[in-house]
């Protein structure tokens, strides 16, 4: 998707056989395969010089016209999918721009059209994923366009009843969109699989089985909880029911799949693009379950392995840790209030932090700065674009011009994805940006923001100071929580959190003692960034919603604290006791947080039974 070097291989010195292997697996034909030749110009050029069987320019022109036809077919299918995901009729205005961008994208990277998996079973997976992506926006499309002016005009021309007409149009668009959705999912995994394969090679079988077991336990817990309460993703109380989470809106408005979803604004411009391939099949499964909140339950269950793996990727980057120590640290991370509770929330931050973890792991462990992962992190949460300034480790200090060029190219690829994959609705929702500034508090009291920040830092490990309150005013954005509704919110912060100050101070000490490690530098960078976002810009302070950001920023504090403990144990020559120390800390932390967890669950079961 973002490796233009691959597409311009003819400018590189590569062997014909290497080019073939990178374009297509060996199972897909001989060296004279027409698909191979049309896929990559350099393959054709090298073969043309060595064989007289091609018929010269005529054959080359034939391949080019064939590929052009495939481009046009893909663009038409893409337009159908973009219309299905449209926020409004005005989306039609930007379709030509998306079509043009997609044309140039496929011109320079043929994999979107012609990449093939090694095993046929992958195609079934891609088809089911594409089906889920195309079916997900149907309900919103039907309700949004039933009374639109275009439908009225078409109804007058055809004489068909409006609801039936909308359903027919929707069915046609779904069928037409399947090809692009299939190619896009296939392309997504073509980019992700090499990264995933390299990362999986670093894992021991014990680690993989443990991650699977922990995920299974938490998924069962999610299923049991959602069968008894709908508080974690309420069907009509869309936001701020538990803390300041918009979990209900994420489910109701299909933020995981709809490119033009209401939650996928400038904050998360490419969120659906980097999430739908993971959750589209679980969405299909949810349609088969005879449970009222099946969609929320299944999608939350599907997020659990991502949540667990994200934590373990951060832990695995910590140097000089044995398997037992890493697994003990996983227990500690999931025993924290944030780590445990976010396993039960369908939240965008879970996906956003996953892409951050992938990027940092690839960079730190493999010294590979993948633009695909940078755009994934920034596209799912725009503030993660700050990681674009991190470059690969080099023997010589990189030149400033080279660094700037790398950053600009990454940004250009992100903007290209925004245009080519139908996410221009983000730009059309500029009026919503003004509303987002209501969540900031730049001119507010710095001391008040500092107190809230200290509470935020404390909540990364310990239970937030929260409880049931009665809503006394409507929510500005959604206006869906009625006056008098019981919600679970953080109490106003009136003092500096001592626990937050201690955690912040220990994190700084952890950095100072490990300042040469790139993981330590990245973690400190994120800690400083969190301070700037909350204390300077005041993001989230106006609604006192600090707990929600513990998932996004909490991992940096966790890593720095572990690095500090690791250093202290080394000084005391107690490294062999690290695993029991982490495990005991995890058990103690969970027991400390248990009363608050129990109180929250009692609230959910009492006021919002399923």
Residue ranges and their predicted role:
Residues 314-335, 521:
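Transmembrane-helix signature of polytopic, membrane-embedded enzymes
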Residues 219-230, 405-499:
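Membrane-lumen/periplasm interface segments of specific transmembrane helices
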Residues 301-321, 509:
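Transmembrane-helix motifs of polytopic, lipid-linked glycan transferases
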Residues 261-297:
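Short hydrophobic/aromatic helix or loop-helix immediately within or flanking a transmembrane segment
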Residues 339, 351-368, 556, 560:
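Specific aromatic-rich, kink-prone transmembrane helix
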């Amino acid at each position: 998707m973002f490796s233009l070097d691959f597409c311009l291989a003819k400018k590189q010195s590569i062997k014909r056989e290497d080019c073939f292997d990178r374009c297509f697996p060996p199972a897909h034909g001989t060296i004279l395969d027409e698909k191979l030749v049309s896929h990559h110009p350099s393959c054709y050029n090298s073969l043309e010089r060595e064989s007289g069987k091609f018929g010269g320019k005529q054959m080359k022109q034939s391949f080019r016209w064939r590929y052009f036809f495939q481009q046009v077919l893909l663009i038409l299918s893409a337009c159908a999918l973009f219309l299905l995901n449209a926020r409004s009729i005005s989306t039609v205005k930007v379709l030509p721009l998306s079509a043009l961008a997609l044309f140039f994208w496929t011109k320079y990277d043929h994999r979107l059209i012609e990449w093939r998996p090694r095993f046929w079973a992958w195609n079934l997976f891609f088809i089911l994923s594409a089906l889920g992506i195309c079916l997900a926006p149907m309900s919103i499309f039907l309700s949004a366009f039933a009374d639109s002016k275009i439908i009225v005009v078409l109804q007058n021309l055809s004489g068909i009843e409006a609801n039936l007409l909308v359903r027919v149009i929707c069915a046609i668009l779904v069928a037409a969109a399947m090809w692009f959705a299939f190619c896009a999912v296939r392309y997504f995994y073509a980019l992700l699989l090499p990264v995933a394969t390299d990362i999986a090679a670093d894992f021991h079988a014990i680690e993989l089985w443990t991650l699977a077991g922990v995920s299974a336990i938490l998924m069962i817990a999610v299923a049991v909880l959602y069968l008894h309460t709908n508080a974690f993703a309420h069907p009509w109380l869309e936001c701020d029911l538990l803390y300041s989470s918009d979990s209900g809106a994420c489910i109701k408005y299909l933020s995981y799949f709809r490119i033009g979803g209401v939650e996928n604004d400038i904050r998360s411009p490419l969120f659906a693009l980097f999430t739908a391939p993971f959750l589209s099949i679980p969405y299909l499964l949810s349609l088969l379950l005879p449970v009222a909140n099946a969609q929320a339950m299944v999608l939350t269950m599907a997020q659990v392995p991502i949540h667990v793996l994200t934590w373990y990727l951060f832990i695995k980057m910590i140097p000089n840790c044995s398997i037992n120590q890493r697994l003990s640290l996983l227990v500690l991370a999931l025993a924290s209030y944030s780590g445990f509770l976010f396993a039960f929330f369908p939240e965008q931050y879970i996906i956003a932090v996953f892409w951050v973890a992938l990027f940092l792991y690839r960079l730190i462990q493999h010294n590979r700065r993948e633009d695909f992962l940078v755009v994934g992190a920034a596209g799912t949460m725009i503030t993660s674009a700050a990681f674009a300034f991190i470059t690969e480790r080099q023997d010589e200090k990189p030149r400033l011009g080279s660094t700037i060029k790398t950053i600009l190219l990454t940004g250009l690829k992100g903007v290209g994805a925004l245009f080519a994959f139908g996410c221009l609705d983000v730009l059309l929702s500029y009026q919503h940006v003004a509303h987002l500034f209501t969540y900031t508090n730049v001119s507010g009291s710095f001391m008040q923001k500092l107190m809230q920040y200290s509470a935020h830092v404390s909540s990364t490990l310990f239970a937030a100071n929260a409880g049931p309150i009665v809503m006394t005013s409507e929510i500005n954005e959604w206006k869906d929580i009625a006056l008098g509704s019981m919600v679970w919110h953080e109490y106003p912060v009136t003092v500096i959190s001592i626990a937050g100050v201690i955690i912040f101070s220990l994190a700084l000490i952890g950095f100072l003692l490990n300042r040469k490690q790139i993981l330590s530098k990245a973690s400190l960078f994120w800690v400083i960034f969190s301070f700037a976002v909350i204390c300077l810009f005041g993001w989230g302070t106006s609604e006192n919603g600090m707990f929600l950001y513990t998932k996004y920023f909490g991992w940096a504090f966790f890593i720095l604290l572990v690095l500090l403990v690791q250093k202290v144990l080394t000084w005391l020559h107690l490294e062999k006791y690290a695993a029991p120390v982490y495990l005991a800390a995890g058990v103690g932390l969970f027991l400390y947080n248990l009363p608050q967890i129990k109180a929250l669950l009692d609230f959910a079961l009492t006021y919002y039974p399923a």
